[in-house]
Amino acid sequence: MKKMFVILTVIFLMMTGVSVVTAEQKIVDRHVNYTAGGVTMKGYLAYDQNIMKKRPGILVVHEWWGQNDYIRNRARMLAKLGYVAFAVDMYGDGKIAEHPKDATLFSSQLSKDFDTVKLRFKEAENILRKQPQVDPDKIAAIGYCFGGGVVLNMALQGADLRGVASFHGSLGAVKEVKAGAVKARIIIFNGEDDKFNSKEAIESIQEKMKNAGVDYQFISYPEAIHAFTNPDADKYGKKFNIPLAYNARADKESWKALKIFLEGLFK
């Protein structure tokens, strides 16, 4: 009897035009190859197949290690929140660094060539906007470490994004801010004890954003250091003797703040 009541209720709602929302998720993911400046880029797309309507798209830019399992997992986490997430390949050919020396080489080469950064970011953005599940007018970006610096630079140079979020991003790599050109709202999550971001770099970027009238938030987590959102940070820190460490509290709190931030962007 109870089952029959549920069936009749669903039929009634469908007949009256009321949308029926299912709590069941079906996260699908796939690799997407594209080109930027003649280089093959290997992106990664994730979304909930059971959501029928178009939804916001989020670009996810990797740490200095490259587009690895960690960053693809973040894309899947965003898909579970109802977004279409596209993990960007900034290095090309899906290159992954296994050692900090390689990571430094890959990231520094791009940091010195912002035109290539813009080209690769823009091509990934175009791929995301064209996905049939995506509302092309609702695009944001998040980035980690090296990727945090990338999304900040793109936003501060006037990229057409609703918002960007930087997690333990490279704040010292930020270029000049174009006053009046910034369209995106910005949120920065930083570890208070992050050795990779100096006090001067933090003060400099905040001063630049204030002077340019940027809508931004800066959140600092006590006792958190670089890579605080990455559960593998402890392993990397010990293996290579570099100041990286996972901080579960900062990870949880920053992700919660991100969810609120994204909801505010697209409401």
Q: Which ranges hold each PLM region?
A:
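Short beta-strand/loop motif that positions the catalytic acidic residue
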Residues: 188-190
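Short, proline-enriched alpha-helix->beta-strand connector loops that line the catalytic pocket
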Residues: 181-186, 212-215
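Bacterial N-terminal signal peptides
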Residues: 7-17
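Serine-hydrolase catalytic machinery in alpha/beta-hydrolase-like enzymes
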Residues: 31-133, 231-245
